[in-house]
């Protein structure tokens, strides 16, 4: 919605759609003040949980979200319900998991103290190999890629 190519002071926004029974925001990644990361952003997730095959939101549906730090000072797996908000102050986060039958939407809001706006991230090295297996894969047609100018795929 609001990538680094658009005008803003420090805010970045992105939307993610995760079909029911699937994962997103994986491999776990971070955008914090760590030596290997080029940016320092805090991130807030705003979740909506739907009902498969409808445009309705679900009071009963749920998902999961994981956040952790290498030193173990943060290590949480939280159950997400429709309308929940989760703040990631630092550390690796992901995956977000949508329960079968309950597609998940989330709005990511990022901001940080740096002068340059960037959505850059660093994968958890333990799981980075997973990203390398995606080369050549077609995007999932249930998750359309769009910009402010419309659908790109």
PLM features per residue range, with description:
Residues 42, 75, 101-106:
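Short edge beta-strand segments in beta-sheet-rich domains
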Residues 79-101:
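Conserved metal-binding segment of the jelly-roll/cupin
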Residues 1-44:
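A short glycine-rich, His/Asp/Glu-containing loop-to-beta-strand
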Residues 11-13, 75, 85:
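Intrinsic-disorder/low-complexity, polar/charged segments enriched in Ser/Thr/Lys/Arg/Asp/Glu/Gln
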Residues 1-3, 100, 107-153:
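Double-stranded beta-helix
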Residues 51-54, 70-73, 92-95, 101-102, ...:
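Short Gly/Pro-enriched loop/turn and capping motifs at secondary-structure junctions
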Residues 47-82:
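A short beta-strand-loop-beta hairpin characteristic of the jelly-roll/cupin
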């Amino acid at each position: 919605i609001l990538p680094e190519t658009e005008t803003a002071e420090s805010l970045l926004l992105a939307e993610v759609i995760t079909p029911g029974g699937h994962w997103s925001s994986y491999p776990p990644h971070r955008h914090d003040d760590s030596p290997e990361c080029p940016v320092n952003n805090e991130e807030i997730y705003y979740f909506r949980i739907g009902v498969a095959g409808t445009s309705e939101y679900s009071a009963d549906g749920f998902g999961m979200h994981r956040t952790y730090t290498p030193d173990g000072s943060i290590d949480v797996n939280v159950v997400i319900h429709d309308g929940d908000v989760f703040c990631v102050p630092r550390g690796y986060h992901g995956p977000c998991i949508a329960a079968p039958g309950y597609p998940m939407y989330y709005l990511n809001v990022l901001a940080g103290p740096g002068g340059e706006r960037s959505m850059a991230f660093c994968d958890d090295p333990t799981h980075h190999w997973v990203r390398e297996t995606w080369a050549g894969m077609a995007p999932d047609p249930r998750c359309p890629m769009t910009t402010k100018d419309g659908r790109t795929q």
